[in-house]
């Protein structure tokens, strides 16, 4: 497992989330000023410098449910609200899109170019805010400084870590099905055409060398595909040509997007029940995640501006039906707990929360699990 995977996972999934929200805000004809506020608020929260500093520290990946909690908080960082079914669908679309991109990366290192494509597109979603643009550019430099010099082996380990994270997800997405890159079981179809990885040759030729390293024979073979040489290597510069198209906004053409659980995924969900035995690693993960989310500085809606609900389904009826048919094990419920405000009951939590930039000094609580959940609700 690579300790450098989390920033790439978070930024790419966050980019996909912003693509989807932008498309739905336009599809539902949300007024321009409200849509602009939502996008700017979420992007500003996502690229908060304190949060980025925590994110880029070497660390293991969080569980799917823990990471989902981060995006739930992030999606509600402004005046927009999503109900459970829409949030489930949003997360399904995000994860399947990035899984597809990781699978199709020609080289393991190209996952960095995919990330830069997301950052480039995110900057295009920012309106009238040079400060937020500067936040994204700073993260861009942080990303290239850390990952630009990694070896091919280190990127291979990152790619393997990502694929392990995604390995049990087989959710059908209408865009992928229509483009024939996903089959009815929810698995992706790998192409046998297109550019080969940069630095490699088009298959079809075998060279034989003698013991002195001199080429003595060439044999051609049919590879069964339609490959071409890569035109050039993607740039890591701020305004460079990434060449690779993976990670760009596939929702720029306005079309509805549906998700469906495959039969295999439903069967897997029905067989996989949450264990009631406490996980000994859960406390450590909660503490780490609390530190990570503590840097997000999520703003509460204030003032007279009313909030609004965004629906990721075509109609409210579809949304309600999706909530009823989704397997219980695949829903990520957020628990809200009203915890007591006793500052002396948990010295460890007091120490951790002292590192956060929280204006309300009275936000303290009792038991460890409840403390963490209450803190999440307060952010």
Curated annotation (Swiss-Prot):
Keywords: Cell membrane, Membrane, Transport
Coiled-coil regions, chain positions: none
Protein's name according to its UniProt entry: Protein OSCP1
Gene: OSCP1
Location of the protein in the cell: Basal cell membrane
Disulfide bond entries: none
Role, per record: May be involved in drug clearance in the placenta.
Pfam families per UniProt: Oscp1
Domain of life: Eukaryota
One CC-aspect GO term: basal plasma membrane
């Amino acid at each position: 497992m690579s300790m450098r995977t989390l920033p790439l996972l978070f930024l790419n999934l966050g980019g996909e989330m912003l693509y989807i929200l932008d498309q739905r805000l336009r599809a539902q004809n949300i007024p321009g000023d409200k849509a602009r506020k939502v996008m700017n608020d979420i992007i500003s929260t996502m690229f908060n410098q304190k949060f980025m500093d925590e994110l880029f520290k070497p660390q293991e990946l969080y569980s799917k449910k823990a990471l989902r909690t981060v995006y739930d908080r992030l999606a509600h960082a402004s005046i927009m609200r999503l109900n459970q079914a829409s949030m489930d669908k949003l997360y399904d679309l995000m994860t399947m899109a990035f899984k597809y991109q990781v699978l199709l990366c020609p080289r393991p290192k190209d996952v960095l170019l995919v990330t830069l494509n997301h950052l480039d597109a995110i900057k295009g979603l920012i309106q009238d805010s040079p400060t937020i643009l500067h936040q994204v550019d700073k993260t861009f430099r942080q990303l290239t400084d850390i990952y630009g010099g990694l070896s091919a082996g280190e990127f291979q380990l990152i790619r393997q870590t990502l694929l392990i994270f995604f390995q049990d997800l087989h959710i059908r997405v209408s865009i992928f099905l229509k483009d024939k890159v996903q089959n009815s079981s929810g698995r992706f179809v790998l192409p046998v055409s297109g550019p080969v990885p940069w630095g490699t040759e088009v298959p079809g030729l075998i060279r034989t060398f003698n013991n002195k390293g001199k080429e003595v024979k060439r044999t051609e073979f049919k590879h069964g595909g339609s490959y071409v040489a890569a035109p050039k290597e993607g740039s890591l510069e701020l305004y460079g040509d990434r060449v690779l198209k993976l990670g760009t906004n596939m929702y720029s053409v306005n079309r509805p997007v549906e998700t469906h659980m495959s039969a295999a995924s439903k069967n897997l969900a029905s067989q996989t029940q949450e264990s009631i035995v406490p996980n000994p690693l859960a406390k450590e993960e909660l503490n780490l995640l609390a530190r990570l989310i503590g840097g997000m500085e999520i703003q509460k809606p204030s003032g007279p501006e009313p909030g609004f609900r965004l629906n990721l389904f075509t109609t409210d009826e579809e949304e309600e039906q999706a909530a009823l048919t989704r397997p219980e094990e695949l829903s990520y419920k957020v628990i809200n707990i009203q915890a007591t405000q006793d500052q002396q009951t948990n010295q460890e939590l007091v120490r951790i929360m002292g590192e956060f930039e929280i204006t309300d000094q009275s936000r303290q609580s009792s038991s460890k699990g409840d403390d963490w959940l209450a803190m999440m609700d307060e952010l």
